[in-house]
């Protein structure tokens, strides 16, 4: 498709959408868009501050690599809210009149690129974090010697560049991103699918997203099973496993949030790609799936805000007090210190220790 012909879909799509647009309340949609954008930006900003502070405090390799990837994920969510939310509010404020403010289809293309990138990149980073933790738990020697912060930064850059490449594929193939039926967002062509290329972009996007979720699930399952086996087999290195446990809990929460939020949208896009113009998917269904996917960028930062040792410890104490249970300062992250205390007590009660104490007291008497 030539560049001149690529400019035509903006106006033609807008004309077709005029008859198939979703019936949405403009004022209510503007209000919710502003609320979602504000909450997302504030939440991700708070999570970025927490992760950066944790990265400065924990310089150990096993923690630093995870925190770098987590920071990249939250920063991606932050800019996704900032760009996508800002464009959406502008579209609503302009009464969704794309022909008037975007005749050249530039804004729609930017919107579509940002939608694809901010959708796939967090999923890719989530699977990368799961792989990193799986290696750290199953092969700690290789992780500590081969996976450095420099390597993690290179991997982070590579993941982001691949997500950018996927987002730019339609532009490189001289295809425009299309205004969707609700006239509030832009994405791949989901209406009036003409050829295999339209189906390819939708299937490629859905396949990559579902693959990332599958990798996260597999790696987290292996990590969890390994930690359980080590726990029952040996009681050494509790403190090291406590860091693994905290990060795995966060990974499981991210995976659950991503699956719940993104699966409907990914399956919907795959359904449209497979069935084409005969797809039973309605505009309202697609818009609902999109809004669920948007919630992923809001919930992701709260995983790092809430699922921290200090917060969980306080929540545990609060819940126990509310239930009327007497609390002993005992939780999973303090087992190592208790074990060390027991070891010290056992050594102090041994005969050798008693002799040393008697010699020390006699010398003190002299």
UniProtKB/Swiss-Prot annotation:
Transmembrane segments: 32-55, 70-90, 110-131, 153-175, 199-224, 251-267, 286-307
Disulfide bonds: 108-186
Classification via InterPro entries: GPCR_Rhodpsn, GPCR_Rhodpsn_7TM, PglndnF_rcpt, Prostanoid_rcpt
The entry's keywords: Cell membrane, Disulfide bond, G-protein coupled receptor, Glycoprotein, Membrane, Receptor, Transducer, Transmembrane, Transmembrane helix
Record flagged with keyword Disulfide bond: yes
Biological role stated in the UniProt entry: Receptor for prostaglandin F2-alpha (PGF2-alpha). The activity of this receptor is mediated by G proteins which activate a phosphatidylinositol-calcium second messenger system. Initiates luteolysis in the corpus luteum.
PANTHER family: G-PROTEIN COUPLED RECEPTOR FAMILY 1 MEMBER, PROSTAGLANDIN F2-ALPHA RECEPTOR
Protein's name in the database: Prostaglandin F2-alpha receptor
Originating species: Rattus norvegicus
Originating gene: Ptgfr
């Amino acid at each position: 498709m030539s560049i001149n012909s690529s400019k035509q879909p903006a106006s033609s799509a807008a004309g077709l959408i005029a008859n198939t647009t979703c019936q949405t309340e403009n004022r209510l949609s503007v209000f919710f868009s502003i609320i979602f954008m504000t909450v997302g930006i504030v939440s991700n900003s708070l999570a970025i501050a927490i992760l950066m502070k944790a990265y400065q405090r924990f310089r150990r390799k096993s923690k630093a690599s995870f925190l770098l990837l987590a920071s990249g994920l939250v920063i991606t969510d932050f800019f996704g809210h900032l760009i996508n939310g800002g464009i959406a509010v502008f579209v609503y404020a302009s009464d969704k009149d794309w022909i008037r403010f975007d005749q050249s289809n530039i804004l729609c293309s930017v919107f579509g690129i940002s939608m694809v990138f901010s959708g796939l990149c967090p999923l890719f980073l989530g699977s990368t974090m799961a792989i990193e933790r799986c290696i750290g738990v199953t092969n700690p020697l290789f992780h500590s010697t081969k996976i450095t912060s420099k390597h993690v930064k290179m991997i982070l850059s590579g993941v982001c560049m691949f997500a950018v490449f996927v987002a730019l594929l339609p532009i490189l193939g001289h295809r425009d991103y299309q205004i969707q039926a609700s006239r509030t967002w832009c994405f791949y062509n989901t209406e009036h699918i003409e050829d295999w290329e339209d189906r390819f972009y939708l299937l490629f996007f859905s396949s990559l997203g579902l693959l990332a979720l599958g990798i996260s699930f597999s790696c987290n399952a292996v990590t969890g099973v390994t930690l359980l086996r080590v726990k029952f087999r040996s009681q050494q290195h509790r403190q090291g496993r406590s860091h693994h446990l905290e990060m795995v809990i966060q990974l499981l929460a991210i995976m659950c949030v991503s699956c719940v939020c993104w699966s409907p949208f990914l399956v919907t896009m795959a359904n449209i790609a497979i069935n084409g113009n005969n797809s039973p998917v309605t505009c309202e269904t697609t818009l609902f799936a999109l809004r669920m996917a948007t919630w992923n960028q809001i919930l992701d930062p709260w995983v790092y805000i809430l699922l921290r040792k200090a917060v969980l410890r306080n929540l545990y104490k609060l819940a126990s007090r509310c239930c009327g249970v007497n609390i002993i300062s005992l939780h999973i992250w303090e087992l190592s210190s208790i074990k060390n205390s027991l070891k010290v007590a056992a050594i102090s009660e041994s005969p050798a220790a008693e002799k040393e104490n008697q010699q020390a007291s006699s010398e003190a008497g002299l």
